[in-house]
Design a protein with these regions (language model features):
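Residues in the short beta-alpha loop(s) of Rossmann-like NAD(P)-binding domains
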Residues: 69, 137, 162
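C-terminal hydrophobic helical "lid"/dimerization subdomain
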Residues: 119-123, 127, 167-217
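NAD(P)H dinucleotide-binding glycine-rich loop of Rossmann-like/cofactor-binding domains
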Residues: 1-42
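Adenosine-nucleotide cofactor-binding segment
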Residues: 41-44, 56-120
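Local beta-strand N-terminus motif with an aromatic residue
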Residues: 36, 81, 104-105, 184, ...
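Rossmann-fold NAD(P)-binding glycine/threonine-rich loop
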Residues: 135-153, 170-173
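Glycine-centered, small-residue-biased loops immediately flanking beta-strands
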Residues: 129-130, 154
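N-terminal Rossmann-fold NAD(P) dinucleotide-binding loop
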Residues: 48-49
Length: 217
């Protein structure tokens, strides 16, 4: 157990344990984002949205959000993304190169957990970039991409919790929320009772929610 401030709302606290901590840590610790960095985040679920906020809090100058759901992209914009790309309509790597004057992103955060999104992450990165893989593909699935995408001194990092330190970072994230620097309220897309849990899973599978809360009366 990690103690947090007493005035921190418990419904918001329930978000910290996995998605928010992973995305924030992926940007701050694993991604090592610095002021003025250009950042590419693919996947705008709760993990990706938290990574976008981590990039904003780190001082990134360009934050490119990529998803296939326009509602999620709108949410990403409200959390700090400076540019949105719907990759059903555009090639994310090509648009990123245009937005970064041909360079590519300094830091890339993959939060979609798909074979194609991992390849797109590498394609969008500049030589010497740090590519952080937060998403998880189905267990046992093989990842295939051209070897040349690993060239150019790119550093590829795989982390499940963003290299976060719960005893330090839980209280820090609570403070960031209470001082209105971390946005959590819009991440709660739905509140439902336990007997409606299957509806929550259906909406999650459709990509309609960032996070659902199960309320026990």
């Amino acid at each position: 157990a990690v103690p947090i401030r007493n005035d921190f709302p418990l419904d918001k606290a329930s978000l910290l344990g996995c998605a928010v901590m992973t995305g924030y840590g992926g940007a701050i610790y694993a991604g090592k984002i610095k002021p003025a960095d250009r950042v590419f985040v693919i996947g705008c679920g709760a993990v990706g949205l938290s990574a976008i906020q981590g990039a904003r809090l780190a001082g990134a100058s360009v934050i490119i959000a990529v998803a296939i759901n326009d509602k999620k992209l709108k949410l990403a914009k409200s959390m700090g993304a400076t540019h949105n790309i719907n990759d059903l309509n555009h090639n994310p790597a090509e648009v990123t190169k245009e937005l970064t004057f041909g360079r590519g992103a300094d830091c890339v955060i993959e939060a979609a957990g798909q074979n194609v999104s991992i390849q797109q992450s590498l394609e969008a990165s500049r030589p010497g970039a740090r590519v952080v893989i937060l998403g998880k593909t189905p267990f046992g699935e093989k990842i295939n991409f051209p070897f040349n995408l690993m060239m150019g001194e790119r550093e590829i990092v795989r982390t499940s919790y963003g290299m976060s330190r719960p005893r330090i970072d839980f209280p820090k994230l609570a403070d960031l929320y209470m001082t209105q620097k971390l946005i959590l309220d819009p991440m709660i897309s739905m509140r439902l009772k336990l007997e409606n849990i299957n509806h929550g899973f259906d909406e999650l599978e459709k990509g309609n929610v960032a996070r659902s809360l199960v309320i026990f009366d």
